[in-house]
Amino acid sequence: MATPQRRGARIRRVFWALFWLMFWTGGLVLGTALGYLHFASEGTVSRAVVAYITGETKPENAFPGKRKLTILVVGADENRDNRKRVVDSMARTDTILVAQVDFVNQRIHALSIPRDTLVRIPRHGWGKINSAHALGGPRLLVETVSNLLGNLQIDHVVIVSYKAFEEAIDALGGVTIEVEKRMVYHDNWGDLHVDLQPGVQHLNGKQALGYVRYRHSDSDFHRIERQQKFMRAVKERLKDPSVWMRVPQVLAAGLRHTRTTMEFEQLLALALFARQLSDEQIRTETLPVRNGPGTALLVKREEATQLIRELGFWDTDTYSYAR
């Protein structure tokens, strides 16, 4: 099955950076959101905002000596029982994205990895890549992704709960989108319940989460297409001036449900860097795969190697897709 190239939405505004990362269309920067709330809580918001606006928060200061920065962006949630009690905080991941920020060449390249991709998980044998987080948390997922991409060094991790998505959409006042077909799906273990009618609808946070996560009878690629379609709808929503009155609530939702290895000052620097890029300086692709056993997907090795080189993830031509 041919894998079409996936184009994510492009960062144009500071606030859009939050959604670009958090909702999976190819981003990595929620710096403004996290940085703003962090400094506000410390009582020094004015200093942080001034530094951001004037450009004092620069990558070379936040990441000394770094030419490139590779970030693993993960969308995950808790597993729950039939009574909606959390039974496992290290759930399978629904979204896996590797984004590389190139400070020298002034660009951001990102690679999304389908969650059903079959890989070798260190010390656990073969399995779908989305199970690595459940088996060993962020550390094992980082190791698995690094091995998959030719021992690529991953510098930082951002893990976003789907609760952040749900609450942020509610804070926006919902999003209008055309639902392509009847969608019904119930998963108590993953706390996912979808019941949508076809046609143009205004979705609240829970409905929107169901729309972007719905996968029953669909392939991983259909789900990715819906996620990107939804993000275009979010972008349209953000053009409404009245929405900006809701910014504090949306940012608060992102902060409450996001974990990252980066400092807030570093996130601010990334947001500033991303804000200055044009559409042509941002590229998003999907790892080339083909149908495998059952519902698993197998990496197309030659195509994957070529694509990863094109994205500039490797500093030399000696690497190749390993396993």
Model regions: which residues?
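Non-catalytic, solvent-exposed segments at the cell envelope interface
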Residues: 2-323
